[in-house]
Amino acid sequence: MMSRLNSVVIKLWLTIILIVTTVLILLSIALITFMQYYFTQETENAIREDARRISSLVEQSHNKEEAIKYSQTLIENPGGLMIINNKHRQSTASLSNIKKQMLNEVVNNDHFDDVFDKGKSVTRNVTIKEKGSSQTYILLGYPTKAQKNSHSKYSGVFIYKDLKSIEDTNNAITIITIITAVIFLTITTVFAFFLSSRITKPLRRLRDQATRVSEGDYSYKPSVTTKDEIGQLSQAFNQMSTEIEEHVDALSTSKNIRDSLINSMVEGVLGINESRQIILSNKMANDIMDNIDEDAKAFLLRQIEDTFKSKQTEMRDLEMNTRFFVVTTSYIDKIEQGGKSGVVVTVRDMTNEHNLDQMKKDFIANVSHELRTPISLLQGYTESIVDGIVTEPDEIKESLAIVLDESKRLNRLVNELLNVARMDAEGLSVNKEVQPIAALLDKMKIKYRQQADDLGLNMTFNYCKKRVWTYDMDRMDQVLTNLIDNASRYTKPGDEIAITCDENESEDILYIKDTGTGIAPEHLQQVFDRFYKVDAARTRGKQGTGLGLFICKMIIEEHGGSIDVKSELGKGTTFIIKLPKPE
């Protein structure tokens, strides 16, 4: 109900009705009052004119009785005529009740003294009680020449008339006026409602459009064809709606681009407001914050507080467990609505760069060491032979064997470096063929039989000779050679090395398992990285270059497969190779 009363249509309709009703009431009152006054005046004027004629007739007539009788024929109500010579000397014995009361009114009302003393016409409304009811009469006194035996300056012609006919006429006029006003008000009500509805229809459309715009719907554009202010308002609103839609689309596009850029960044990005609340973050930042420890959180909070105080860009290094970050905080004057300031935090994960830098350092140290040792041996034994220190044939042969072994070691190191460089420059190519896996494993079995016996290792091969795989023989030979060499290097006499085949619905699987020293958990994620080497104390004798497992991974991935490692420190390591089955 209240919502309807608040409607512009209802308000405008009620306003029009109120104005029209007020005007009709005032006009009706004025009309009724005027008509009452008009008929009263007309009656009074008619009575006065009758009184004047009777007065003139009486004054000019010599026979007063005949003049009075004749006068009674001149008026509408002959019984309402009284000619009084003396106000204070009148007999009421033969008069009717009404005339008695009228005569008493003339005698007792001082206003009528002016008729007898001053010769003025006097009119009064007199209420007469008769038969238990009251009736109003108009009583007019008109002066005439004093008659004989009169003690006053003037005699008076008095005429009275019942006002009931006037009242009936006024009542009829009042009823007609009220009925006319009601009919006019009804017509006005309908017309006002129609007019207000028509006038406010464009406004209601604009209201609906504004509601839709507030809800994000800019497609509704009402058509208002009028040329008035409402039509101009509608056109302006439609134009505004179009511009808002364009601006919102532009802002949405900018926001989407910004969010996409922020989410695609490799750095974690956080937006912090004055209340130290996170109002913006990307996926990388969420991942970092989910895995951050309390000390790192305290570090970030301190840097954020320092940035709020200094309002300068701060850049600091953060080390957390085995990960390394560079944290940059920048002060922003306006980061959210209301002109509130804040801080943008950028967290860059530098773990890979740090590890790569460390691996390069280790690689340089290892390669230098690997090169220095065989070169020193080559130099020492060749100098011994050249200088004649070693002269016995057996000693010379032994020295040359050492020189040959160290030369092979240098050649292997250089070849690995060249292979990696070639892979980086040209990529790795494999020539896959469908062939029995037994061909590869038989080759490995023969190749490492003597080495296993020499090292005291129990090496077993368990595979199905009829099963065929899709692989490059030379490349897979390189992979297994590297893995079995590693297993031999990290085991001791009595340990086991097992090479086993398996399969699932879509892949052929090869396990290389040893019971050696194993790999610590913190090294597992990095064993396939370039130049990465685990603790040298784990190895038996010679160390590698840190490139073997990296090359293995590249070869397996080029086959469309994967390589993984599982290890438990002190219990052994298992490398798992998965290759797609032949189509």
Curated annotation (Swiss-Prot):
The alphabetical list of record keywords is: ATP-binding, Cell membrane, Kinase, Membrane, Nucleotide-binding, Phosphoprotein, Transferase, Transmembrane, Transmembrane helix, Two-component regulatory system
Q: Reply yes or no: does the keyword Lipoprotein apply.
A: no
Please name the InterPro entries in this protein's record: HAMP_dom, HATPase_C_sf, His_kinase_dom, HisK_dim/P_dom, HisK_dim/P_sf, HisK_sensor, Light-responsive_reg, Sig_transdc_His_kin-like_C
A single GO BP term for this record reads: osmosensory signaling via phosphorelay pathway
Annotated membrane-spanning segments are 12-32, 175-195
- The stretches that face the Cytoplasmic side, renumbered to this chain, are 1-11, 196-583
Record PROSITE patterns: HAMP, HIS_KIN
Reaction(s) catalyzed by this protein?
ATP + protein L-histidine = ADP + protein N-phospho-L-histidine
Which intervals lie on the Extracellular side per UniProt? 33-174
- Domain called Histidine kinase: residue spans: 366-583
The membrane topology term of the UniProt record is: Multi-pass membrane protein
Q: Tell me the ranges covered by the HAMP domain, including all copies.
A: 197-249
What biological function has been recorded for the protein in this entry?
Answer: Member of the two-component regulatory system SrrA/SrrB, which is involved in the global regulation of staphylococcal virulence factors in response to environmental oxygen levels as well as biofilm formation. Also plays an essential role in host-derived nitric oxide resistance by regulating hmp/flavohemoglobin, an enzyme that detoxifies nitric oxide by converting it to nitrate. Functions as a sensor protein kinase which is autophosphorylated at a histidine residue and transfers its phosphate group to SrrA.
Descriptive protein name: Sensor protein SrrB
